[in-house]
Amino acid sequence: ISPLDDEGQWFRYHHLFADLLKTRLQNSLTKADVQVLHQRAARWYEQNGMIVEAVDHALAAADHHLAARLVEETALPMILQAHVRTVERWLQAIPSEMVEKSPKINMAYAWMNLLRGMLPAAMPFIDRLRILFAQPQTDPWSISLQAEWLAIRAELLMSQGKPAESRDLDPGAEAAARS
């Protein structure tokens, strides 16, 4: 066991010992019991601000609702901090029917593809956002999320050499951004 901090609260097991413990856990508990442990770990990590670990445990528990909520909250900041592969792994693990309903997850997919220069791959997500924002909602989408969507669309049009079209996306966008 190796200490990870000066206070003696965090320790790391040798990787072989950790593997032994994981094997014993899997051999002594049912799959459902292991899933419950992963759910508890996910919630603990979330409460302690360790979102990467929380998402990984939520996915290991097959708790896609918790994983999707956590990804919605953290995907964009992580993409902007160059953690694209981690976010991509998470996004691919979330069922497609959940992706289709989540503006934030679609936004993450769009940004991830745009930042990689994969414009055609971003288009389905940008188009889905247009559809999601057009639907009547009991809770309207936040103005900032819609403004971000407009920014993505403008970036896409600019990259296609259409600056005039990017300025004309939404006449109310400029007013909304100022309010």
Predicted regions and their residues:
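C-terminal boundary/linker of central alpha/beta nucleotide-binding cores
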Residues: 1-24, 36-39
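Residue-level detector of family-conserved "landmark" positions at structurally sensitive sites
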Residues: 3-4, 55, 68, 169
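Short, glycine- and charge-enriched coil/turn segments that flank and shape catalytic ligand pockets
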Residues: 6, 28-32, 134-140
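Residues that cap or initiate secondary-structure elements
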Residues: 17-19, 27-29, 155, 164
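Active-site micro-motifs of SAM-dependent methyltransferase domains
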Residues: 19, 76, 131
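Extended alpha-helical scaffolding segments used for macromolecular assembly and cargo binding
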Residues: 26-116, 121-125
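Internal alpha-solenoid helical repeat scaffolds
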Residues: 96-179
